């Protein structure tokens, strides 16, 4: 199938078809450009959306690290990566499809113009040959008519008896001249005819088929280029599918990481005050005086009245605690956090101690480095003056002493808080025990007996030195609340941390309080803190 043989007489239609092909190419290029702009705008809008909803937190922000919030932030990160992949798609389409198709469109326009010009030039040359042949044909026809007239004139004069010999001779010469001119025009016409036939054969069997062949090849290349662009368009999407799939998988994993129990525990850690709920108001039996008067005719004052709690004191204490369920009174922030509830105060003090400990470790490391540098300078004076390090060493020493004093002061406050919490718990258990004993000794009349010795046995005995209790408590290890598997190795160089290897299984004895550290225990009983992000935790289900 060839345009040169099948469409030898369809030059105008082929010209229109090739122009339509170029117009369609430009139309597809416009489509790709608009598709490219859509991808760019989509990626830009996604990035703006992520930027809008990403947390803008300062270094001092103490936003609770809820798993639902962390999951959402991870989803935003994955969405940001997804937007980056849309930008990659736009870039691929721009370079591999749009730029290529625009370059090819310009090339094919020039090539088409050249082929059509060659076809028109061949047609013009054939038309010129036809015109020359037609002119020679008319001349030959005219000369033949003139020769025929000359022959008729000669024959008429030759048969005329009245004609002179000179007239006959003159007519004869004219006949020979016209006959000669007719022969020459005949030869010229024959030559022009032969030439035109040859050029026409060459035109329709060689020149035009060659031109049409080039046009056909050009149009087929245009079709192939469109096919390649279609495929490149799809390949640009296909290349990013694996990464987009990872982004979507990351979103799914972020959704699975939401732990409602952990979020509930974070709420407890953030807002737990450490206070005990208000106690019950005691029943004050004013009728017992009436019953005693009716039964024995006397009015007596109960001996256990001194054991009754003062209603005014009870109400006062209750009112002092009821702010937990209402609006918390605001007060100035104190250095020892005494304006905070006990549990929050303990947490803030522990955080400050941890921060001061890290600063202390940095200062000690800096002091060690300065001392080593000083030793090097003393051994090699050409490297530096040891005396130049004395101010810096003195400053570091002063900072170390200051930090140690701060840590000691905060540890004292922390011990005070923990002691108060422990005493409050003991008083609660003591009150419960007294309440049970008092119920056992209550008389049917609503009065109390005077068994003071029994009350003495029920009262719990408090240690004079509560710090001894802490020492005994440390001997008994904390119970494990779950286990974990280390995902990465951790050297545990800092004080209080626990070194672990990758894949090592540990017991969890204390959950992350929101500072990024989890307390764990090894199989050999060694305890310490490990980074929460380095382990995979499995907590025991609470019965």
Curated annotation (Swiss-Prot):
Q: Which Gene3D superfamilies match?
A: 6.10.140.470, Arfaptin homology (AH) domain/BAR domain (1.20.1270.60), SH3 Domains (2.30.30.40)
Spell out the subcellular localization from the entry.
Answer: Cytoplasm; Cytoplasm, Cytoskeleton; Cytoplasm, Cell cortex; Cytoplasmic vesicle
In which broad location class does this protein mainly occur, judging by the first location in its UniProt entry? cytoplasm
Disulphide connectivity of cysteines: none
Spell out the residue ranges making up region: Disordered.
424-467
Gene Ontology CC annotation, any one: cell cortex
Q: Which UniProt keywords apply?
A: Autophagy, Cell membrane, Coiled coil, Cytoplasm, Cytoplasmic vesicle, Cytoskeleton, Endocytosis, Lipid-binding, Membrane, SH3 domain
Which residue intervals define the domain REM-1 in the entry? 339-416
What sequence ranges are listed for the domain SH3? 479-540
The processes (GO biological process) annotated in the record are: autophagy; endocytosis; signal transduction
Q: Enumerate the spans annotated as F-BAR domain.
A: 1-263
Q: A single Gene Ontology molecular function, please?
A: lipid binding
Its transmembrane ranges are none
Which residue positions hold the site described Mediates end-to-end attachment of dimers?
165
Subunit info here reads: Homodimerizes, the dimers can polymerize end-to-end to form filamentous structures. Interacts with GTP-bound cdc42 and wasl/n-wasp.
Q: Which family does it belong to?
A: Belongs to the FNBP1 family.
Q: Quote the function comment for this protein.
A: Required to coordinate membrane tubulation with reorganization of the actin cytoskeleton during endocytosis. Essential for autophagy of intracellular bacterial pathogens. Promotes cdc42-induced actin polymerization by activating the wasl-waspip complex, the predominant form of wasl/n-wasp in cells.
Q: Domain description from the entry?
A: The F-BAR domain binds the phospholipid membrane with its concave surface. The end-to-end polymerization of dimers of these domains provides a curved surface that fits best membranes with around 600 A diameter, and may drive tubulation.
Q: Supply the name of the protein.
A: Formin-binding protein 1-like
| Organism whose genome encodes this protein | Xenopus laevis (African clawed frog)
